[in-house]
Design a protein with these regions (language model features):
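Solvent-exposed beta-hairpin/edge-strand motifs
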Residues: 61-101, 152-176
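Early extracytoplasmic/domain-onset interaction patches
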Residues: 19-67, 114
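Beta-strand elements of well-folded, non-transmembrane domains
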Residues: 41-45, 51-59, 68-70, 121, ...
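A surface-exposed beta-strand-loop module
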Residues: 75-78, 82-150, 182-214
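Positively charged n-region of N-terminal signal peptides that target proteins for export
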Residues: 1-4
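Intrinsic-disorder/low-complexity, polar/charged segments enriched in Ser/Thr/Lys/Arg/Asp/Glu/Gln
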Residues: 34, 46-50, 59-63, 114, ...
Length: 214
């Protein structure tokens, strides 16, 4: 009995290693996603964002965006960048996620929320380039402390950018960033994440003082 069990474990080990290796290489190694956050005034706790991604896995027919705990999402939209076609989007919560048979990669709780974007099932060799836009409200991660804006969020994608609200300038960033100014005068921070995990980004900023007339 013990010999049979040991043999089974020996046979299972290479399979488990191969599956783990495939999981590590299949998504992150080819990922070209980028995301841009446009911060609204900090007292609103809200920010708009868009992210681009290319889906190329055969048989895939939807994209799931699981909303982080403590956040709420509104106005989700998705378009095919190659054609401009708008895709059907729905937001599911709690029991509706279970009823739809959707696996969000974590236990489904009453407060769980996921944005589901559906598209025709991809054939072998086919790719789909998407742009997804949403508005989030997250008082725990985006707030005003005294006169200082605080944005505290982890980034998992390779390329991430944050655009400060109009009139704000950067005071601190916990992660190295490239600063630039947008055409409408807003400060933009670009982050690169070369790691297979997340970077914890903490940004603080203050509002510029109005210039007084001479």
């Amino acid at each position: 009995m013990r010999a049979a069990l040991a043999a089974a474990l020996l046979l299972a080990a290479p399979l488990a290693i191969a599956q783990d290796r495939a999981a590590r290489l299949s998504e992150r190694a080819r990922q070209d996603r980028e995301i841009v956050y446009f911060l609204q005034p900090p007292e609103t706790h809200a920010f708009d964002l868009y992210h681009n991604l290319t889906e190329s896995r055969e048989g895939v027919d939807k994209y799931l965006n699981v909303v982080r705990a403590g956040s709420t999402v509104t106005n989700p939209k998705a378009v095919v960048l190659d054609t401009g076609e708008a895709l059907p989007v729905e937001t599911l919560r709690g029991e509706a996620i279970r009823a739809a048979g959707i696996d969000i990669g974590e236990p489904v709780r009453p407060e769980s929320e996921v944005v589901v974007i559906r598209f025709p099932k991809l054939a072998a060799g086919q790719t789909l380039r998407l742009r997804i836009s949403e508005t989030y409200k997250d008082p725990g991660r985006y707030r005003l402390e005294g006169d200082e804006l605080v944005f505290d969020r982890s980034f998992g994608r390779p390329r991430n950018a944050v655009v400060l609200p109009p009139g704000y300038y950067l005071t601190n960033s916990s992660i190295p960033t490239t600063l630039s100014e947008t055409e409408d005068g807003r400060i933009r921070l670009d982050f690169v994440n070369p790691r297979p995990d997340e970077i914890a980004v903490l940004i603080t900023a203050r509002k510029r003082r109005a210039r007084t007339a001479p």
